[in-house]
Amino acid sequence: MHEAVDQRLVDIQDEVRGAFGWALDEDRVAAKALVQSASECVKAVPSWSEDGRRDTLDTLRIELSSAERVTVLGAAATEQEALRVSQQEGLIIAADGSVGALQVRSRLACVVSDFDGGAHLHSAAEEGVPIVAHGHGDNIQRSALALSEWSQFDTPPPLVLTHQTPTSCHGAHNFGGFTDGDRAVCFALAMGVDPQ
């Protein structure tokens, strides 16, 4: 599924992959593996079914598109920057480990992550914060391990699955962008957030 607001946001993935010499096939395998990992946990977490993930996406779309303001907290955000953002009106989308800089998470809509946010991502997942979880060629094992662990939480996080291939992957979306921060902005735009 492609839901990028502009095809160029998906095309950049091919450009970056090509510049680094990374194989597209690895990203395809990762996308399918991510969907499979979520499916294997459906017994423990029914909301991780395809319908459940679609409901999570619909809920996030409604929340984000109706928010007066949405701020993306970039991966390198400091605690001071996070404090300033958390004092503003509106919702916050955190890029991966930047969620650790947020002292108060009451306005945190979701975390966009490729599973390398460490303890901060784990903590947000344990709190039941929705995760826009991304599969790519070098995080297959890390994503499977994280989903397996998260499925055991008292309140597993709602999931939206994403990938970075130019073709569709049943059960996952491609909103565009390459880094967690890029993908957070692309996700916000795809959810109908006004870029102003």
Model segments located where?
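N-terminal donor/sugar-recognition subdomains of glycan-related enzymes
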Residues: M1-V70, T78-R84
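Glycine-rich anion-binding loop/nest that anchors nucleotide
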Residues: V72-A77, G177-D180, P195-Q196
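Short, glycine/acidic-enriched capping/hinge loops at junctions between secondary-structure elements
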Residues: G74, E81-S86, Q103-R105
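Short active-site-proximal "capping" loops at secondary-structure junctions
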Residues: A77-T78, V99
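Acidic/Gly/His-enriched mid-domain segments of enzyme catalytic cores or analogous surface patches
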Residues: G90-L91, G97-V193
